[in-house]
């Protein structure tokens, strides 16, 4: 795919950008393959040697990524996959800050432009103020009907292949909230304000047993908190501080999806920055010099451990 390849035009009334994002990024193997591709893997044998993956699973995922324009026919990265760097950088920063076992082993990031070790800051491109989950207003866009956003793949039991993918991941907690279609859809719904079990089930069409498992996982890792107003009322599931901190991951993933998968009736989700009142275009900036980041200017001390190209 050439660098100036246009975005994919989605079918009217079909899956929207969120649905396409969940289908591509809401899959542990896809994330791991893309991670390795951005770190230099470009041959089938390299993916096989770096990941505990079977030939059949690798062949299927590579075919999907080629068909979706994230890899070329010879497994080189494309503009579409290279533009995922803000998502990966946001994942890295969230795990560094919020997952205790990572705090002393993740390598530092250096901003080549200013030469300083830095942390990425999500900010509003219009007013340049830092933004987090509490400063954002998430609203359903013209193409944002849940029937078009929810995962299209049928659910299935977790297989040994999926367990191997999770064990291979450098960021297991992120995989728990993004590396599965239903989990990623649940995260989107939570940011849109959904909090009741029945509302999650109705909006997403997720089987009750799967929803129960995902909600429990989100609570176990501290992304959601479950509260009940009274003994007769069912729990409400709300984003914790750790959950709201996933705004950077979600926003960069949504912006990537809505850049590359365009519905004729408009975006699936519209974000507004409460601070300035403008529609949000998020960007990552260096917390040391304040300049906007670009992928080519981010250096890491140990690229293999970082998972960032």
Regions found by a protein language model. Name each.
Residues 62-63, 215-216:
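Short, hydrophobic-biased segments on the C-terminal half of alpha helices
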Residues 59, 212:
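Conserved catalytic core of two-component sensor histidine kinases
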Residues 26, 74-90, 94, 231-252:
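Basic, amphipathic "hinge/linker" alpha-helix immediately C-terminal to the N-terminal HTH DNA-binding motif
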Residues 2-22, 151-175:
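Short, Lys/Arg-enriched N-terminal segment that forms or immediately precedes the first helix
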Residues 68, 93-99, 221, 256-260:
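Alpha-helical linker/hinge and terminal dimerization helices associated
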Residues 96-163, 262-309:
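C-terminal regulatory/oligomerization modules of transcriptional regulators
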Residues 66-74, 219-229:
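A short, conserved structural fragment
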